[in-house]
UniProtKB/Swiss-Prot annotation:
It is an enzyme of class 2 (transferase). Anthranilate 1 binds at G79, N110. NCBIfam families: trpD. Mg(2+) 2 binds at D224, E225. This is Anthranilate phosphoribosyltransferase. InterPro entries: Anthranilate_Pribosyl_Tfrase, Glycosyl_Trfase_fam3, Glycosyl_Trfase_fam3_N_dom, Glycosyl_Trfase_fam3_N_dom_sf, Nuc_phospho_transferase. Homodimer. Anthranilate 2 binds at R165. Pathway: Amino-acid biosynthesis; L-tryptophan biosynthesis; L-tryptophan from chorismate: step 2/5.
Amino acid sequence: MKEIFLQISNRQDLSQDQVQAVFDRILKNEVSESQIASFLMGLKIKGETSDEITGIVRALKSHATVLPETFTDAMCNCGTGGDQSYSFNISTTACFVLAAGGIRMAKAGNRSISSKSGSADVLEVLGINVAASPEILSKALDEVGLAFIFAQTMHPAMRFIGPARQALGIPTIMNLVGPLANPLDLETQLMGLYRVELQEIVANAIQQLGRKRAVIITGPDNMDEAALYGTNTYTLLEDGHISQHTFTYEDLGMEKVELSDITGGDAKENAEILLSVLRNEASPYLETTVLNVGLGFFANGKAGTIKEGVELARQLIADGSALEKLRKLQEVQV
């Protein structure tokens, strides 16, 4: 580690291979907590690069639990979190609608860290076994076209990094790595990101990881979701090209929804919100969900524009298809 620390202290970027080698040791519990904290803080001060992000992701995937069946067409819409918006579980709600639209969703997530209810917490209330075995996850992906991929189950070696992250108490490169470390080789991705200035770096990492198409979204006030107030900024990876764009609720012909109107609660309250959306009950929650689903369909290529994606989202909720996906997952991922 001495040579690595020296290189970082000289503000020299690390190669993918260097970072992957360091994390391979970390994930084998061969590096002390203080060294891990120093490494993460050093990268943060220097400024993280796409190669460094990719190196960590590849190390994590090499230590991840493997599913018995291979899927090459999956998508994830997991975000970084950490935006302090305290909104309801938007991407978790959206994943059922995306799956209803024919996209195989490998929805990664975790328990609450900075909010009252993480994706794992709300799905548990709904009777879904978030810690299901790899065999059950494969069955769900095959039969339902949707599975919840629990970070703690699929990345057990991450426990060696947790204490250092908690001791630091600030966002590090690990916040960027989480949504990218899905154990499946994703074809497409919608990733919420809490800092606009990191979008290009993350987009380059996503490209290196082999995604066919992806959108990285940062909402107003650095939300890691799209919102119906202010300006949303997204970076699109398409056909090997990376470009940045903006849009507002007015561009889509939608009504304004303030952040205070989509505040979430605890896991039980957020489960009720999720159900109300899938039942097509009119609310700011429904409007925010269809916006993010529309963006997901655009990220996947299922819709040519975000607006087309929003219309498809409305249809799938209105006809009960999205709610049916939840019912099927409740039957299979148990």
